């Protein structure tokens, strides 16, 4: 996001991966949330079509939650580009 011209504040709420990115000033104000959460007991190795946990009993991502952060960043960049036109 910094490469796209956003101001990025990292490490919010005591979490090193938490951030807020801002672009521009004035109105409209548009907010986009990207979140990752984990569900219990679904740790899974990538690209393995059968149950094969990375860590037995550990949480993992499901239901598309693993794509929300990437989609949020793409949306923020698209909105910024539209605002700049």
Question: Where in the sequence are the language-model features?
Answer:
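Acidic/His- and Gly-rich active-site-bordering loop/insert found
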Residues: 1-61, 70-85
């Amino acid at each position: 996001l910094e490469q796209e011209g956003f101001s990025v504040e990292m490490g919010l709420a005591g979490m090193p991966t938490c951030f807020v990115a801002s672009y521009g000033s004035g109105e409209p104000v548009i907010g986009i949330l990207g979140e990752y959460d984990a569900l219990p007991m679904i740790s899974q190795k990538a690209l393995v079509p059968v149950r094969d946990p990375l860590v037995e009993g550990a949480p993992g991502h499901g239901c598309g939650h693993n794509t929300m952060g990437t989609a949020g960043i793409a949306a923020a960049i698209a909105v910024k580009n539209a605002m700049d036109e």
